[in-house]
Amino acid sequence: MSNLRILILLLCVIALPVAVFAQEPVDSTNENSVEDRIESVAENTDAEIDYSSLTETLKYFKKHPINLNRTDREELEELGLLNEIQIDNLLRHIEKNGALISLYELQSIDGFDLATIYSILPYVKITGDESRKTWNFNEILNQSKSTLFVRYTNILQEQAGYAPITDSALAESPNSRYLGSDYKLYTRYKFAYYNMLSFGVTAEKDFGEEFFSGNQKQGFDFYSAHFFIRDIGPLKALAIGDYTLQFGQGLTIWSGLSYGKSAEAINIKKSGRGIVPYSSVDENLFMRGAAAQFTLKPFSVYAWVSRKMLDANVQAGDSMNTEEFVITSLQESGLHNTQSTIVDKDQISEFVTGARIEATIRRVKLGTTGYYTRFGQSIAPGDQLYEYYNFSGNENLNVGLDYSW
């Protein structure tokens, strides 16, 4: 009998650390959670992407965690940490079994491994006061947040483009030296009331660009501003200024951040967020104008209009071309720090207008999107074999159909 007691006591001692671990509260205040997520996304893409919009989204949900028992598909898609199958399984589990009683219950849902659960823990909860946010002026003043961010970057080693050069050498190779100073300056101001209202201004000067001098007397080389409001009756979203559009899988139209490759094949499928306010510094991947979404369940209707200037290479038209100048290619670097890049700046206008209608019935979404694009000058790609299927002309009409379940 004494041996049995010793055995039971020994088993209790061994099991104690496991039991204690299981009772530890969930640490949802991991200070590195946002940085870890950005690093994970960066590891799965080869492109140089500005992650400020993703960072802002994660920081918002870290401060205002999603109540999983009261959430919907759109909010979970906005978080960007779960794929379509995981979102479906979570919503079906709650619909079938009722509200979650513990975050550890996520382990019983198909598709939620420990890595996924740990990645979303800082941004979710299952309890708390969930009184609906209202459009009250006093509440907007008391609960809103203003953020001013300034970043200065400089490379200590002298770069070749800033080294002294003789006038004769510069005349022979005018693009061998940068026109401006050797630092990068980025500043952003944003006012936000939860995720319902935001407006802000972003400005950036790249390495080698002039600042309040020469060709940049207006100061920064790039300015961006937006006003965004949502959830006012049937008006689901309204964006004025700079914004991005994300629909379907991006074959018809998609602007802004998009996750590319992934180690998991299941993560290839995208989750479009519709109309998204733009506050990043990429000088190409956005719309400039206005966009609106109206919802009358089960239908949602989107409409948008945009006009902005694009950088492009310009060449004189030949004798067979009715236009005096043609565009041979569009420039996407956003840099304006040499003679040639200054010449290419804002050479062509882009006008875009379009609409989308989608229907969501339970977990089935069906949508159709169409938009018209007109450029200020004709685009005439070169005659190389790899350019054979490149766009040519100055007008384009895109129409697409997408579905998801």
Located regions from the model:
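Short, solvent-exposed coil/turn linker segments
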Residues: 3, 65-67, 99-102
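Bacterial N-terminal signal peptides
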Residues: 8-17
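Sec/Tat signal peptide C-region and signal peptidase I cleavage site
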Residues: 18-22
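Long, highly charged, low-complexity intrinsically disordered interaction regions
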Residues: 23-81, 85-92, 127-133
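Outer-membrane beta-barrel channel domains
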Residues: 78, 85, 91-92, 96-99, ...
